[in-house]
Amino acid sequence: MTQVAKKILVTCALPYANGSIHLGHMLEHIQADVWVRYQRMRGHEVNFICADDAHGTPIMLKAQQLGITPEQMIGEMSQEHQTDFAGFNISYDNYHSTHSEENRQLSELIYSRLKENGFIKNRTISQLYDPEKGMFLPDRFVKGTCPKCKSPDQYGDNCEVCGATYSPTELIEPKSVVSGATPVMRDSEHFFFDLPSFSEMLQAWTRSGALQEQVANKMQEWFESGLQQWDISRDAPYFGFEIPNAPGKYFYVWLDAPIGYMGSFKNLCDKRGDSVSFDEYWKKDSTAELYHFIGKDIVYFHSLFWPAMLEGSNFRKPTNLFVHGYVTVNGAKMSKSRGTFIKASTWLNHFDADSLRYYYTAKLSSRIDDIDLNLEDFVQRVNADIVNKVVNLASRNAGFINKRFDGVLANELADPQLYKTFTDAAEVIGEAWESREFGKAVREIMALADLANRYVDEQAPWVVAKQEGRDADLQAICSMGINLFRVLMTYLKPVLPKLTERAEAFLNTELTWDGIQQPLLGHKVNPFKALYNRIDMKQVEALVEASKEEVKAAAAPVTGPLADDPIQETITFDDFAKVDLRVALIENAEFVEGSDKLLRLTLDLGGEKRNVFSGIRSAYPDPQALIGRHTIMVANLAPRKMRFGISEGMVMAAGPGGKDIFLLSPDAGAKPGHQVK
């Protein structure tokens, strides 16, 4: 049946840029990729995008811990994430970052429209503050007991047990995740998005019938509890986008994170030189379809805040949300100690991507059910289905076709009715792929595979091959088997991209959804090469052991500058502003008689001379080499009387000490007396 081509934009939830991709992440990206590949096979115009969620306090603090900038950390993490997704053959058209100019502009645009339309409210709130670290605590940096279901060890924004959202101040017995201290309350002005104004619109959207029943039911519970205004601002220090005309205030990561979908698509349009498509997909009256694949833990943000933000800023809402459950391994939560918290890159060191893609797909449905990766069942199912049923169908027929008929298939089908049974299944299987009933699609395909193998068993080409005068029968039987293999692989193409490539090379033709209506007759195939290898439990054992070793390595003591010399306690901006740093010219440098550590520096501050004693002699055995250099000094440090004289300041240097001391210098152009700001 001919379909009208649709314009479709598909997204996955944005992975957070402070950690590696693991098998829990991969469920969603595989699910979305299978659906996208099917849509492309049916001739639809699909844009499949994602990005790293790159803002927030966790990223800022982890970068500090690593001794690098947040920008450097998220850049490195983006490369790692993209490598992992490419390894699993996730066919993104674009992978971007929320820390981008596109996302900044769109975040400011949406915020300004919401503000102009009266949906942004200002008020002073009492907020949890870490007295030991000197910082306000983001939601995810406070833990305590859920105020709704009383589950312990829950984050400050939502409960992973009951799904409730709340303010971190509502937590019972809260603790700072940063220091372990009990937070104290401090006042701060914050900006709020007026979510209750959109209650009627959101309830109508919920009742439209597009959302999964479980999602709609959960949303109804939230409506009955009453929607609350949403705090969209955070106080400095914070890594993110500063709110326009609000110094020291930043957009909360959950405001600009979903806008990252738009930012990534805008980046893709700009790369293509296509200025039309962005509005075509995101304008209020867009006829394009927009789907978000997400986990059940972020339904609240995507089903309430996100559509309300879009509505309030005159953009289109999502067509639907496709929500999935969590991944367990061997019936339990992924565990680092048991070696079942498995990174995507670790998996690819032991198994190919198609194996996990197939196993997840075989278990997925349109419901929000958790998926268990039972590693023993995984081995058995991959071997039984992919190797024994599908690949074996090709291998047991290809040998005869290659050896006896120079790779040429028969001119007629041996069993046209059986072939029709296979092609007639396209509607049922296609509908299963379309509706995300992936497990049903796989069951239908494997039932056909059983039928195909039964046909070969009954026809027994290995027996026919030994009988004189039956060459035509042998060619017909084996050609039939290969044609049935082609249909099966066409149905499995969205799931098994690498196996599909090898199958297409053998069949000497591209596998297309509509192409199966015409069997390969009188067609020459290529010599058969092994398409897929069996897997075994030894590989699983090696995978689990490797995951355990990675955990041990990650737990090893951190080495490097920060380990030896940790960052000091946080200071306020006012504290920092008291330090007057100036550019100084070193006019003279000499040894200090009676000291094996000090150099006497004569510094020119642009009209004022200073005498400074500095403990850098071990790194600069020839003090004359410093004369003429510019450096940075603390100009308002109280003079210090020493037995060699008075030191009138301090020069800035870095390094662990000894010979490894490095005097700081400003860029060319800085002049003596210039203030460092």
From Swiss-Prot:
Q: What is its main location?
A: cytoplasm
Position of motif 'KMSKS' region? 333-337
List cystine links.
none
* CDD domains the UniProt entry points to: Anticodon_Ia_Met, MetRS_core, tRNA_bind_EcMetRS_like
What residues bind Zn(2+), as annotated? C146, C149, C159, C162
Q: Where is the tRNA-binding domain?
A: 575-677
**Which molecular function GO terms apply here?**
ATP binding; metal ion binding; methionine-tRNA ligase activity; tRNA binding
What Gene3D superfamilies does its record include? Answer: HUPs (3.40.50.620), Isoleucyl-tRNA Synthetase, Domain 1 (1.10.730.10), Methionyl-tRNA synthetase, Zn-domain (2.20.28.20), Nucleic acid-binding proteins (2.40.50.140)
Q: Fetch the PROSITE patterns from UniProt.
A: AA_TRNA_LIGASE_I (PS00178), TRBD (PS50886)
Cofactor(s) listed in the protein's UniProt record: Zn(2+)
The protein's location, in the record's own words, is:
Cytoplasm
Q: What does the annotation say about its assembly with partners? A: Homodimer.
Q: What is this protein called?
A: Methionine--tRNA ligase
Q: Which organism is it from?
A: Escherichia coli O9:H4 (strain HS)
Chain's gene name? metG
